[in-house]
From Swiss-Prot:
One of its GO terms (cellular component) is cytoplasm. This is Crossover junction endodeoxyribonuclease RuvC. The lineage of its organism: Bacteria, Pseudomonadati, Pseudomonadota, Alphaproteobacteria, Rickettsiales. It is found in: Cytoplasm. Mg(2+) 2 binds at E68. Its main location: cytoplasm. Binds 2 Mg(2+) ion per subunit. It comes from Anaplasma phagocytophilum (strain HZ). It catalyses: Endonucleolytic cleavage at a junction such as a reciprocal single-stranded crossover between two homologous DNA duplexes (Holliday junction).
Amino acid sequence: MLVFGLDPGLNYTGWAVVLKEPSGSLSLLDTGTICTTSCSDLNDKLFCIFSGLSAIIQKFSVSVASIENVFVNLNPKASMFLCYARAASLLACLSSNVKIFEYSPTKIKKCVFGNGRASKEQIAFVVRSSLGLSEDASFSSHASDAIAAALCHIFSSGNRYGI
């Protein structure tokens, strides 16, 4: 099973491609963050997210995506911008016929860490240990959250040991 994990954001969109082998072993094929801070225009940011994710989808031939649901922020404008980034992310998936699974941030944390209130550091630790990565493995918190989204789908789709 190949899963495309997404952590959408207007300035930083994390992504990850995680493979679960039939044996149950997990591999991180690639991960990264699409940074749009150099774009001053909202439309440019959205196009950058869409085109960047579309290229990754094509490169890895992904057919399943796991994405964080929107959470309500105290700042309505921030929530609105997050929705724009999610829309660009969803459109990239839909335009390539990628099946989308959505999970709340709490569900992702609970599924991956066992606690829905896990910190970014705790999630990063579990992500590294689940994938057999060293403590030196470096990626952004956005990429870590995208990996966690992919792992959540894998763990929710059956036993992580392939039994």
